Amino acid sequence: VVFVALGLWVGREHLTDVWRSFLGRRSNLNDDDEIMSYRAAVTGMLLGSVTMIGWFVYLGTPLWSSILYIFLLMTIFTGLSRVVAESGVAAIITPMNASDFMIFGLGGKLIGAQAATNFSLGYIFGADIRVFLMGVVANGLKLIEGMNKHSRRIVTQAIAIAILLGLAGSMYTILALSYRDGGINSSPWFFKSMPGVIARTALHGLDADPTYWTGLGFTGIGAVAMLVLTWVRQRFLWWPLHPIGFPIMTSWVVDWMWFSIFFAWVIKVIILKYGGAAVFTRSRDFFLGLIVGRMFISGGWLVVDYLTGTVSNPIFWI
């Protein structure tokens, strides 16, 4: 929360102008060159938030806890998007998700059994989020910033169409495979392990446990630590620890990728030391090509599996 709040504070002047544009007041911003108007962007954010809050309220969740849950959810998504955009990691997952905070932190006694059950379902879209739209789209917008306005808007429309087709196609595929072959015969995580986690979390909420003040206290300590790390980095150029790593350092995904990050850092240092900035700039195309090639091979084997009816060609799943 502090990580996101500090970012919003730094951009407060820009965000204030965005809000003025939404209200139709005079501002210092011109959105003619953006992929969409600021009014459309803010309207979408508000409508989406109200819809999600209304969905939880309709399911019997108290209004206050619904608002708090969506606030935490959007804060986590925003923070992870910044981590992906600034650090360059391909995927990341939050160590603490909104459902765990509400159920295990605030406790089932405070939020109620119905809310705990509803929030446990939030694991589906708010916990297992190694790849999520905000992070992917943020990188996509960075890649197209050199295009003209018309081309950028075409790409944005293509992204929206891809999202809709992906939703429809994935839902159909899951249902078709589940009814035809049986979900238990498919991915153990999605059809066995993850539903078990959701069920156990919901049952824990039904126990009506009190608020976990010790855990909330450690949350406060983490907030103070983030403030200190950010302050030290801004005041001392020699400080080696970037605060962007603090919110994700206990994520299991980091355990998988830390050596790759370290290895990439070593390569970058060597290129800059012996080749300079010019060589580093030219070398980026090569390393981007490695990433594209890796994903192309994965997608290619997926097509081969579909055409031949074979399985067991693993795709990088993180």
What do these predicted ranges mean?
Residues 1-318:
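Alpha-helical multipass membrane-protein architecture
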